[in-house]
Amino acid sequence: MHGLPGGGAEMLVEDVRKDVSPKKGHPDNWLRVMKEAQLLGLTTSATNVIGFGETNADRVQHLRRIREQQDEVRKLNLPGFTSFIAWPVQLESNTFGKRNRGQNKFERGAGPTEYLRHVAISRLFLDNVDHIQASWPTMGMGIAQMALLAGADDAGSTMMEENVVSASGTTKFSATEFELQLSIHRAGFLPVRRNSDYDRLDTPDALAGSPEAMCQPPLHAVELV
């Protein structure tokens, strides 16, 4: 076992968790498990779901708890969280969204503008987390391109199989390497392959000879798996 993904964090604020998902564990438990994994030398990531009706202060509290734990682990010369990924709660045609609409004290949902603002704030606030990932499976390629301009430097992976976002009713849960490279290139960046530790790998030019890739020269490297 090499790593432990950071899914399940959602919102590390107890009042929000109790209202939205009372059967899930306390936020402290998520942080404890991730810290144990980090102390064992496993590669870990941190996640955040917004749009539960939480306040801006709740969102900052989530970021603060991640940053504080990252500070503790970095003092031990360990990498801690290699990346941070946020996305809005998915309320499309799934039973979760239908069942809870109007049933909670929180009004749910977060649009593209709110998401992009959160990406930008995350990049500024989490100064000790090296990489911010854009969430194209939940936001689509167009918004993911804008997220790269808002502070994200990682486009994630092609995801040959995905069972969480797809179950929520969204339709875009896989992409070819050509699609990812093209989106990154059109946003003005250079696509670069990586592994889960963010070591850069040889990157074949999936756009070679493609007229669709004719645009401005790339400005900065963007990671992709």
Roles of regions detected by a PLM:
Residues 5, 45-47, 154-158:
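Short hydrophobic alpha-helical runs that function as membrane-insertion/retention elements
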Residues 1-42, 49-73, 99-110, 170-171:
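Conserved non-cysteine loop/helix-boundary elements of the Radical SAM core domain that shape
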Residues 2-3, 43, 82, 153:
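Short acidic/polar active-site loop segments enriched in Thr and Asp
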Residues 63, 71-225:
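Auxiliary Fe-S-binding modules of radical SAM enzymes
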Residues 8, 44-50, 83-88, 136:
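A cross-domain feature marking catalytic cores of carbohydrate-active enzymes
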